[in-house]
Amino acid sequence: MSIETSATERRIRVALVFGGRSGEHEVSCATAAGVMSALDPERYEVVPVGITKDGRWVEGPSDPDALALSKRATITDGADVLLRLDASRELVVDDDAGGVGGAARTLASVDVVLPLLHGPFGEDGTIQGLLELADIPYVGSGVLASAAGMDKIAMKILLAAAGLPVGPYVAVPPRRWATDPDGVRAEARALGLPLFVKPARAGSSVGITRVTDLNDLDAAIEEAQRHDPRILI
């Protein structure tokens, strides 16, 4: 996909998508604030789209100060934004969300999207796939690279297959901890201390525990599973 609109004809219309359902919602908002401040207004027209913690797409604030990390900003409300999947690249606003025959208006026909979502639903290939379906150019890795890069277990498998050195690990699929906890404990014990227990598909250091005593392993696994049923030790 390419950005067909020339900057000499008009400003490039950039949709910033931020917030989201992950535990890094506030950090994503702060990222949007930084990008808003950095984009040259003579070259780019910014279209802010926020995603609430429960997954609603809404018109986002256009003032970067309102999204500063120091304010721990969250996206909570706004007119619903819908993304057309008909290759028109249009974002449509429903001014009467939930109503019958609500008024809809075109917010913008965007040239490119900057996905500024952190963690699940933002860096894992999901929004990238949605934008591919809508035929909207976007910044960043594609679906496969995003999905593989987000999944720590998949990435280790790919690196090992490419002949690169990979540290020893234990992959714990969703049902294994429930059905074979003793087996997981035994494999983890064989790795030696300290252990790092991680959600396989969470961003930053969310849900990660450093284990220096095997008596703390169960609690670390349960903490990681709060963020992802697949975990890595």
Feature names for model-found ranges:
Residues 75, 119-122, 178-179, 230-233:
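Short flexible/disordered coil segments
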Residues 2-17, 22-23, 30, 103, ...:
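Active-site nucleotide/adenylate-binding loops and adjacent lid/helix of ATP-dependent enzymes
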Residues 10-13, 24-33, 37, 41, ...:
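Conserved N-proximal alpha/beta basic substrate-recognition cap immediately N-terminal to
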